Amino acid sequence: MSKLQSEAVREAISSIITHCKETKPRNFTETIELQIGLKNYDPQKDKRFSGSVKLPHVPRPKMKICMLGDAQHVEEAEKIGLESMDVEALKKLNKNKKLVKKLAKKFHAFLASESVIKQIPRLLGPGLNKAGKFPTLVSHQESLESKVNETKATVKFQLKKVLCMGVAVGNLSMEEKQIFQNVQMSVNFLVSLLKKNWQNVRCLYLKSTMGPPNRVF
């Protein structure tokens, strides 16, 4: 049973949108983030969960994705305007921690061809994994474009050392109903990952990039 009150979520979404309309316009579309505080969890002892869920609507259309590809995938990536790197380019990073960290920071997510994904630990070391951005496998049987869209719609919940986290659940160019559906799905999925479900949730806030946080739980 979800303890999230639909009314509270709807109110938070409309107050975020109202706040945005009343303040001076930004030259970018603000993202709406779900901020989560947990309780009764010990990141040292309890299992640190990690899970991804595909939302009904893409929260960040401008999300930056990079294809770590074989020749065919690099060519396909070029056609759809997707940034890509081949094995030679990855070798040039020379496992340099700083460069790998910089690469992980530059993109929100990575995709990789089968022949490349196997070589990633050897080519890059643990950097992408540490950043929680280990690439998603793409086979030649799937459409690269639909894999990109699927990746843009997927959010990842990962518990690190601290008991709080944030995920993008929408943006201010979306309809309220779409944001609401994304929030519901994100929260229900997160709760399913928690050991004691709702008993581990301390608080939930919704917030746009530049706006104040709105508590929904």
UniProtKB/Swiss-Prot annotation:
The keyword Nucleus does not apply. PROSITE patterns: RIBOSOMAL_L1. GO terms for molecular function: RNA binding; structural constituent of ribosome. GO terms for cellular component: cytosolic large ribosomal subunit; cytosolic ribosome; nucleolus; plastid. It comes from the Eukaryota. Transmembrane segments: none annotated. One of its GO terms (biological process) is translation. The keyword Zinc does not apply. Keywords: Ribonucleoprotein, Ribosomal protein. Belongs to the universal ribosomal protein uL1 family. Interacts with the GTPase NUG2. This is Large ribosomal subunit protein uL1x. It comes from Arabidopsis thaliana. The lineage of its organism: Eukaryota, Viridiplantae, Streptophyta, Embryophyta, Tracheophyta. The gene is RPL10AC.
